[in-house]
Structure formats: structure tokens, C-alpha cells
Amino acid sequence: TAVVTLHSAALWTDSRYFIAAEKELQGTEFRLMRERIDGTPTIAQWLGQELAADDWKEVGTDGMCLPQSEAAAMKEELKRNGGLSLRTNLDILDRIWSGRPGVPHAKVSIQPMEYAGETCSSKLGRIRHELLRLGATAMIAARLDDIAWTLNLRGTDVHCTPVFVAWLVIGQDNAVLFIDDEKLTPEVSAYLRHEGVAVKPYGSIADYLRTCNEYAMLIDPDTVNSRLAQVRGHYNTVTAPSPIAAMKAVKNPTEREGFRNAMIRDGVAMTRFLKWLDEAV
């Protein structure tokens, strides 16, 4: 996490990137803050120390990149450290970063039933049942792996992870996937129509939420970002963990067989490597 004030700048990162960050920050104004190391201040503590008495006491961040739970915790900590306030609708990088990469446009593919073991419509039905049990009638699915699992779709937007950039809103009578059209092949579009999933532009989710009426919308503060959590349509909110994570954790027979087959292939690859290493040394 990078933090910039009028007079200083700092970067917080964990131990995986200490060496790389130290190298990259040489010759810059940024100080390296090693997370989870004794003596390293939190962002709020550092800001409370760094901001001069005559500085503006407002901290800006892009709420689209900050989970609601983290935003709430940071807001309280900033208040304790210097009486600072938090603004979550600020994306300065978008204003100054010319040529900033956009959302990836790689095509989405369908996960075959021979690997999924359960249809999308069946998963949506189970999710809707869980929502009612939790006192909700709809939910925002924000985790990319939750969306991919629910819809039996896969993508390549994140390196080494079969997910795609999207949002998903699930209601009792409908489901809406927010994704750029160019990512969908004719086959995937037809598949989504068959499964009862409507498609809207990726950037239109906030406008859509403002039109939602008479919903009890489940919002998981650990997965839904601060900006979306603060959008207010004509609906009540239910704060609770997303039911999808627990459902996804219980593997069906087809998924368990896939795990076994993957472990066999992985074991063969490891054995071949160890054999080569033993003979080469």
C-alpha cells in the first residue's frame, strides 16, 4: 500500500517483497515500511505523525480497492491518530496516469460439467436458499473466485489464477453478471442466457444497485468494497459473510475426483524432478 502526503511518501509491504521493494525504492522519496515487524507503524499511526498541524486533515483513498471492513477500521484508527477523516471516493491515479492499463479483455470460457459436477442453476438455487435463511433476498458477489465457481466460468485475467474481472448480483428471481461484452464469446453468452443470468456492462453496477427495489441485500464487508457498500438504492442491507465461500469449500464427488487426479499428476511431476535431481548432482 502506497501512501503519499504533501511532504512525504511511504510504501507498506510484507516480507515477500522486502528485498524487491528496497531495491525498487532506491533513489525515490518513498520510505519502506515492513509490515508485521516490531516498530513499524500502521498507516494511520504514520499519518498522525507525519501530517503537520496546518495540513488538511482528510485522507483520500479509492474505495473501489478497499473492502468495507478495512475502510471502517481505518476510519476509526485515523480518528484516534490525529483526528483524521477518511474519504473513499478519490482515485488520483486515474487523473494523472496516462496510458493506465484497463480491465483485461481475455475471453471467458465455460467449465465443463465433467469437472464442475454441478450446474450453475443448481448453485444459484442453493445460494438463494441460504440468502433466505440469512434474512436476505439478494447479494453482491465480489470475490472473483466466488463468481467463477457460481457460474461455472473460467478466465485468465489474473496470472496463474483462472478468474475474470466481473461483479455478480444474485436475487431470488434473477442474477446479473457485470462484465465487458467483449470478454464473452457467442457460446458463453448463449450459456448465460440458458442459465438465467443477465449481462450488463462492468462499470454499471453502482447505477444498477441504485435501481434495486424491495431487496434485503446481503453485503459481506470483508469482500464488498467500500464504494459499493455505500451505494444506496431502495433496499435494506444485511451484513453477513458471503454464503458462497462455505458452499464452495464442500467439494462434490466430481470435484473430489478432480483433486485426486491433479495430485497424481503433481506427484508424477515431482517424482520425475527428484529423480533428475538425484542423477544430476
Report the location of each language-model feature:
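A composition/biophysics-driven feature that prefers long, compositionally simple stretches
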Residues: 1-280
